[in-house]
Amino acid sequence: MKILLLGCNGQVGWELQRSLAPLGDVIACDFDSVTDRRADFAKPAAVGELIDRIQPQVIVNAAAHTAVDKAESEIDLSRTINAVTPGVIADRARALGALVVHYSTDYVFDGSGDQARDELAVTGPLSVYGKTKLEGEERIRASGCRHLIFRTSWVYAARGHNFIKTMLRLAQERERMTVINDQFGAPTGAALLADVTALAIQASRPLTGIYHLAAAGETTWYAYAEYVLAKAKQIKP
C-alpha cells in the first residue's frame, strides 16, 4: 500500500509516521520537505501535482492552519490551507480511487450547550478557523472521493505547539496566569489519533464518513492547566 502523508512534521503527522509505517510505503511530506516532496498547502495546485506524481492509494492529510486567533487576520491563507487545498486533494483522490483521511475540529460547532455533540449535530462555526475547517469537510464530501474525516479536540503531543507546552512556558515566565474555566473539552493525544487512523485504514469493513474522535472524559482549560502544573511540580530535576 502506498500512503501519502501530508503535514508529517506536525503533532499528529509526526505520530502518523510511526503508526502508518507497518501498513506499507509511507511517503511523508510537509511544506519544508525537499523539493520533490514539498507539500505547501498555500499552493493548492502544487499539492495536486504532488499527488499526481506519487499516485498514492491512501492520502492522510494532517496539515492545517491551526492558529485559531491568527486565522482571524489571515483569512485568505487559512481558507486556502484548511479548505481549498483539501478540496484539491479530494478531487485528485477521486480520480485515483484513493482514500482520503482528514482531520477536523470541534470548532465547527458554536460551542453552546453543555452536552457532547454527535456526528449528526448541526454545525455553526463562529471563528474563521472553524468556518474554514468546515468548508474543508464540505469540499471533501462534495468531491465524491472515499473519505474518513475525524473531528477531534485539544490535541497534545511531545512534539509541536500545544496548550501543555504553553502553560509550562508561561509558568516559568509569570508570577500569575489567567485561564478560562467555562469552556469544556477533551484533551486528546496525537498518538491516539495516529493509532486509530492506522486501524481505520486496515478495517476489514471499509469505513467512510465523519467520525468524532477524542479521548474520553472532559475538563476545562483551567482544570487542565492546574493538572499540568501539578504534574510538573512532581518531576524532580
Put a short name on every predicted segment:
Residues L16, I51, M167, T197-I201, ...:
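Hydrophobic "lid"/C-terminal helical patch
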Residues S73, T80, V84-V88, A95, ...:
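Catalytic helix-loop patch of NAD(P)-dependent Rossmann-fold dehydrogenases
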Residues F41-I81:
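NAD(P)H-binding glycine-rich loop region in Rossmannoid oxidoreductase-like domains
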Residues E138-G185, A191-L199:
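NAD(P)-dependent short-chain dehydrogenase/reductase
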Residues D30-A45:
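Rossmann-fold cofactor-recognition segment
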